[in-house]
């Protein structure tokens, strides 16, 4: 729920600052100036022009996610349903490398799918019947979903007896919004 000291730029925390030295963590002491923050500040212009292309891309993702947290009531106020217990030892879902859950507010259902692996994954996500009952989701063979991170549309099924198939790039995720 918080961004810490350059995280939005991919800060590595590999400077040799403070008492702990080069340990992969950013110091908590205010006498240090973090490289990515300095480059984002760009001499007081705060325009990020000195950041690398990868850092700018990551910053854009963080901006989008934080904006969604304020715009989407399903995120800020909605009901939560964890899907991990229904996907342990899944044939096309690795609970050690992927994470998924649902959020719902009114007629808006959000399916979050995150892939922490470096390779793309074609996932089969089980949504148990309890989720349909608890969140009052109508079962349908085909829903139109919009990925809130990219704006791309895709068709998905939401059925308790058939896995929902989702493709996710490596080190990436999707927030699929479905209007019920």
Segments from the language model and where they lie:
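Loop/helix patches that line or flank the sugar-binding groove of alpha-linked glycan CAZymes
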Residues: 1-143
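Residue-level detector of conserved, well-ordered beta-strand and adjacent loop positions
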Residues: 102, 146, 177-179
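Hydrophobic beta-strand residues in large extracellular and virion-surface proteins
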Residues: 111, 125, 145, 166-168, ...
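Solvent-exposed beta-strand/loop surfaces of large extracellular or lumenal domains
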Residues: 141-161
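C-terminal beta-strand-rich structural cap/linker in extracellular carbohydrate-active enzymes
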Residues: 156-180
